[in-house]
Amino acid sequence: MWVAHMTTETTVIDARAATAPRRLTQLETLEAEAIHIFREVAGEFERPVVLFSGGKDSVVMLHLARKAFWPAPVPFTLLHVDTGHNFPEVIDYRDAVVAAHRLRLVVASVQDAIDAGSVRERPDGSRNALQTVPLLEAITTHRFDAVFGGGRRDEEKARAKERVFSLRDELGQWDPRRQRPELWDLYNGRHGPGEHVRVFPLSNWTELDVWRYIEREGIDLPTIYYAHERQVFLRDGMWLAPGDWGGPRGAETVERRIVRYRTVGDMSCTGAVESEALTVDDVIVEVAASRLTERGAT
């Protein structure tokens, strides 16, 4: 009787274990959260747009958007603020992705803004800080009311304070007193005329999460994210790529180094890191061992 009782009890326990819901992994939880955010925005807003530069965060964001609405096409336009100082490999990648998935891309040009007198060229040649005006002009012209960005809270203090839904006023300004509480997965997209909401589906991701997701999903990236030989020069402790923007200067000398980029942006302020990481797995090992954030390192 005792043996029979134990056998029956064990069978019941095994049956419960077999039907118990499986716990999601860290990546599965982050993916589900991001997909929910994309669908929430599609339901709340009229003209959402995805900022797409060809950088790894925007690439992952687009991949998640495609998953969120598959097999239907992505219901959002893409927007890229082109500084005119972008890495050629990244621009080629951007155009290839847009063509492959038959997406609509709007390009806001910093050079056009300079020519129109909306912004002035900086003495140091950097155009990274000049992107705000053409971005806001594009948002106004196309009446975008939600703007997806690839910002993550682990990148820097300025981004750590952002909510997932970040309300911006008519001038694109962020006011902490006007931000709404975000309880669980409830998001408030209410906004007034001329205002818009920045949306950050990757807020809770880390750089390592992004790379592990890239590895899991087999996502292709621009080649400059992996180790390659490149002409660079040293300025303020960073390896910068020479270009029409104004480098190198004075005693700065160009040399060839094996480098890769942890983040991509304006060539004038995006530094490379010396690296031998040729594959996604190599990059994951490198990032896991790093004690500097990508912003701090580059």
In which residue ranges do the predicted regions lie?
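Nucleotide-activated chemistry modules centered on ATP-dependent adenylation/adenylyltransferase
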Residues: 2-298
